[in-house]
């Protein structure tokens, strides 16, 4: 699930994904892509 959070590497997406109620994420096309629970 893409969220509107810009990133440079996947480590930056851990907290935004948790804040969005999802598990973890990776950085794709400079945006965070989270895995739903």
From Swiss-Prot:
- Give one Pfam family: Toxin_2
Chain spans, region Interaction with Ca(2+)-activated K(+) channels: 25-32
Q: Which UniProt keywords apply?
A: Disulfide bond, Ion channel impairing toxin, Neurotoxin, Potassium channel impairing toxin, Secreted, Toxin
Q: Which domain of life is it from?
A: Eukaryota
**Expression by tissue:** Expressed by the venom gland.
Per the record, the similarity remark reads: Belongs to the short scorpion toxin superfamily. Potassium channel inhibitor family. Alpha-KTx 03 subfamily.
Q: What is known of its domains?
A: Has the structural arrangement of an alpha-helix connected to antiparallel beta-sheets by disulfide bonds (CS-alpha/beta).
**Would you tell me the protein name for this molecule?**
Potassium channel toxin alpha-KTx 3.9
User: Which species is this record about?
Assistant: Buthus occitanus tunetanus
């Amino acid at each position: 699930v893409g969220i509107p959070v810009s990133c440079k590497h996947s480590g930056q997406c851990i907290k935004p994904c948790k804040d969005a109620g999802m598990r973890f994420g990776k950085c794709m096309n400079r945006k965070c892509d989270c895995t739903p629970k």
